[in-house]
A protein has these predicted regions:
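Phosphate/ribose-recognition catalytic cores of enzymes acting on nucleotide-derived substrates
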Residues: 315-337
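NUDIX/MutT-family hydrolases
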Residues: 330-374
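Acidic, metal-coordinating catalytic segment for phosphate/diphosphate chemistry
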Residues: 214, 218-251, 318, 325, ...
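Serine residues within intrinsically disordered or low-complexity segments
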Residues: 8, 12, 21, 377-381
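Catalytic cores of DNA base-excision repair glycosylases
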Residues: 26, 30-217, 221-230
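The catalytic Nudix box helix
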Residues: 279-313
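N-terminal strand-loop-strand
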Residues: 232-278, 307
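Short, solvent-exposed loop/turn elements at beta->coil junctions and helix N-caps
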Residues: 44-47, 239-242, 312-318
Length: 384
């Protein structure tokens, strides 16, 4: 096959047909030999059928998570909730507990909601029907439709954006130009083999066209890559100017009663961490001592009076939009019956029983410090 020269067509929205054909074929040939094969939801069962439910769960997990991280979560999920009916019938707390550690917990709640809508219905096979389900955007819908049904729908996840930004040496941050990148992905899609092509495109971004140190010599698109021709593939995609993340200091109270139980509350079903359990606390006000923050927040949120007795742990946790510093204190419960004034419910739990509740990732170190402080092993706290 003749290698086509790099030209200005690769910088425009429209690819020449000969360029499109070359890119499609070269990528598929590369994928047959080097693509990722050990992805369980990509393989048919003994009856020769793909598990559409498993594909759906996987694609939602992969929205904000890399494959190697999501894979063990997917395997545990499929063992516990192997069908859409099982998911629809599950308790939300079980769903959140299975998701614990993956972050962006609204994905789990929306999967649960969508399963209740899908129960007893045939699987949707058009874009609009998938987009109508909770938690499904255009790229996820396209990936499900191409993977499960071999339907010709384009995708645009982070890997694909990076590949296309380098292929065209696009000089602006991709987030501001989604329509441009959707146009590129639509043009390149092999409509005869959409399942294979979309998977190959994701594999290319995940294995060769990586954020750092891309393996350009092995790339099937090297001869047509404008970023490679410019000698600067790592400069693409162009990044937004970094902004310093604001820091919030959170005072947290681990409140103990005379029975040695700790007080936890369940967050409202809103925001990234909705429905999860946590140790109560809140933001430090300007000029306020952190111990006073804990006392005030527990009075406002739970209607209880506590005495701060000793520090337990201090830890930092970063989200995409802010940094949090948790100053955690052991507290003695003095008076007041705990009330869920700013949460769904409150509960007294023995420290060894905390593993039965889904907590945000930042709370794992708090729990570990608590168990160590009172001589409980982490193994004894795990749910069988």
């Amino acid at each position: 096959m003749r290698i086509l020269p790099i030209n200005s067509l690769l910088r425009s929205v429209n690819f020449a047909p000969c360029v499109t054909s070359y890119l499609q074929l070269s990528l598929l040939i590369w994928s047959e030999q080097f693509g990722r094969k050990a992805i369980p939801w990509k393989h048919a069962n003994t009856s020769g059928l793909l598990d559409i439910y498993g594909i759906w769960i996987a694609e939602v997990m992969l929205q904000q998570t890399q494959l190697q991280v999501a894979l063990p979560y997917w395997q545990r999920w499929m063992q516990a909730l192997p069908t859409v009916d099982a998911l629809a019938a599950a308790d939300e707390q079980q769903v959140l507990l299975l998701w614990q550690g993956l972050g962006y917990y609204s994905r789990a709640r929306r999967l649960h909601q969508a399963a209740q809508q899908l129960q007893g219905q045939p699987w949707p096979q058009d874009l609009e029907a998938w987009l109508a389900l909770p938690g499904i955007g255009r790229s996820t819908a396209g990936s499900i439709l191409s993977s499960a049904f071999d339907r010709p729908f384009a995708i645009l996840d982070g890997n694909v954006k990076r590949v296309l930004a380098r292929l065209t040496a696009f000089e602006h941050p991709p987030a501001r130009h989604s329509a441009h990148f959707w146009s590129l992905s639509e043009q390149l899609l092999d409509r005869q083999r959409p399942r294979d092509f979309n998977q190959a495109l994701m594999d290319l971004g995940a294995t060769l066209c990586t954020p750092r140190q891309p393996d350009c010599p092995r790339c099937p698109w090297q001869s047509h890559c404008s970023a490679y021709a410019a000698g600067s593939p790592e400069q693409f995609p162009v990044k937004e100017s970094p902004k310093p993340l604001p820091l919030q200091v959170i005072g947290v109270g681990v409140v103990l009663n005379e029975a040695g139980e700790v007080l936890i509350d369940q967050r409202l079903n809103e925001g990234l961490l909705g429905g999860l359990w946590e140790f109560p606390g809140g933001k430090q006000e300007p000029g306020e001592a952190i111990e006073a923050t804990v006392v005030r927040e527990l009075q406002e949120e739970l209607a209880i009076e506590v005495e701060v007795t000793e520090p337990l742990i201090s830890l930092d946790h970063a989200y995409s939009h802010k940094r949090l510093r948790f100053e955690v204190f052991l507290c003695r419960w003095i008076s007041g019956e705990p009330q869920a004034l700013a949460s769904q419910q409150v509960r007294w739990v023995h420290p060894t029983g905390l593993a039965a509740f889904p907590f945000p990732a930042a709370n794992a170190r708090i729990i570990a410090a608590l168990l160590q402080r009172f001589g409980h092993s982490e193994e004894s706290s795990k749910v069988a």
